A protein has these predicted regions:
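Bulky hydrophobic/aromatic packing residues
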Residues: 62-69, 97-103, 108-109, 136-137, ...
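Active-site loop segments of alpha/beta catalytic cores
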Residues: 1-35, 42-43, 124-380
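A contiguous, low-structure linker/loop signature
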Residues: 77-140, 168
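Short, charge-rich binding segments
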Residues: 60-63, 82-87, 160-164
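Segments that shape or occlude catalytic/ligand-binding pockets
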Residues: 32, 36-79
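Generic hydrophobic, aliphatic-rich segments that mediate packing or membrane embedding
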Residues: 53-57, 88, 154-157
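Compositionally biased, intrinsically disordered low-complexity regions
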Residues: 5, 23, 29, 75, ...
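Short active-site-adjacent helix-start/loop capping segments
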Residues: 29-32, 69-71, 77-87, 103, ...
Length: 380
């Protein structure tokens, strides 16, 4: 079976004969392991040239060995006519001849830290406190034109990757859940305060955010994606009642849109699912993905499978730090075998994955070993 066939089978009621191997957030993995993964210079993800982009994508796909890949966006044809990347002794610059603007590109930092080594978090100086302010910050997109990005060339890189890999790897894109998007509106403290004191305003923000999520899903379908990864963070910190009213209905509608377009949905819920299991399953996603045990909570894949009981596919949650990065090969093999066995008890509706992104300290060879072991141990 190809990787795509394995994943498609894992979503089916019959399950898959061969367990697929994936990592979550391959963009983080690529950023943190660029020099190990490709011979291309660090600025090539910015170049307005499809073949140069394809060159580093080919190297990454060949070295990683997983069964899916993320479909990127790209410059329009007009942008490609006007934008150049210039590597100079003093740095790398992006020039736009339409405006004369010159932007210095900064090499991405391992771990995603700022130049000062700080974590980047959102702390707005003023909070949006009215529906009008929210509407101004989250404008509703114009009517969707499914052919626009194809005609203007923004899908060209995605189409090139699909021509080369789409028959045997499963193409995905990422969206955020509507409530999680509220973090970008209010920051952590503001989001939590609004959920507690202004739930009607939060619901309005979620309604607006849902339009952005639906548009992202429509664009993903138009460029050839087969699956959507729905990311959600911080919602383990709110009550089950707030979760039921401010999160579940909006994620359910996002899932329904994904299904209506013929795509599969993967709901990645970050944090402790205690007290919210049935709500998580009630959104109707095609698959559920959870973190590994950490931060004081326990998520055992065997317990996940018992709770899901075949109602949807389950993604594995291999520990990205203690096992993938630091464990022995024997420990890694044993945990993959244990999780695969648990997945078989979910009717083989199972995709082996990690609970969190690959860490900067994990080698490329180790990630390839993980994928190879899954393919070995996941074969019937």
């Amino acid at each position: 079976m190809s990787g795509r066939e394995k994943i498609e089978a894992a979503f089916s009621l019959e399950g898959t004969r061969e367990i697929p191997a994936v990592i979550c957030y391959e963009g983080i993995y690529i950023r943190d392991h660029w020099a190990q993964l490709t011979t291309s210079p660090w600025w090539h993800p910015y170049v307005p040239n499809v073949e140069l982009q394809m060159a580093w994508h080919r190297e990454v796909i060949a070295k990683t060995g997983q069964d899916w890949f993320a479909l990127p966006g790209f410059y329009s044809l007009e942008d490609r006519e006007s934008i150049t990347i210039e590597a100079r002794p003093e740095g790398v610059f992006r020039r736009d001849k339409r405006t004369g603007a010159v932007e210095r590109l900064v090499e991405p930092r391992v771990g995603g830290w700022t130049a000062l080594g700080e974590v980047e978090s959102i702390r707005p100086t003023e909070l949006a406190e009215t529906t009008e302010e929210i509407d101004a910050l989250i404008p509703v997109p114009a009517a969707f034109d499914p052919g626009r990005r194809t005609l203007n060339g923004q899908n060209d890189l995605a189409f090139a990757l699909l021509r080369e890999y789409g028959d045997y790897l499963f193409p995905i894109r990422h969206v955020s859940s509507p409530l999680w998007i509220c973090y970008s509106l209010w920051g952590f403290e503001g989001m939590m305060s609004m959920i507690a004191t202004r739930p009607n305003l939060v619901a309005h923000a979620c309604e607006r955010s849902l339009t952005l999520g639906i548009r992202a899903v429509q664009e993903a379908a138009a460029c050839g994606a087969a699956g959507i990864w729905i990311e959600e963070c911080l919602t383990d910190m709110i009550s089950p009642e707030a979760f039921a009213s401010l999160n579940v209905p909006f994620v359910r509608r996002l899932v329904e849109e994904i299904r209506s377009l013929g795509l599969k949905s993967i709901y990645y819920y970050c944090g402790d699912p205690a007290g919210k299991w049935e709500q998580l399953l009630s959104v109707g996603a095609d698959a559920l993905s959870l973190e590994e045990s950490k931060k004081g909570f326990l998520i055992d894949v065997e317990d996940v499978v018992e709770r899901v009981n075949g109602r949807c596919a389950v993604l594995g949650n291999l520990d990205a730090i203690e096992l993938l990065e630091r464990g022995s090969e024997e420990e890694l093999r044993a945990e993959i075998a244990r999780q695969v066995a648990a997945g078989r008890r979910n009717g083989s509706r199972f995709i082996m994955s990690l609970g969190s992104p690959v860490t900067p300290g994990t080698t490329v060879e180790r990630v390839r070993l993980y994928c190879d072991l899954v393919h070995e141990l996941g074969a019937e």
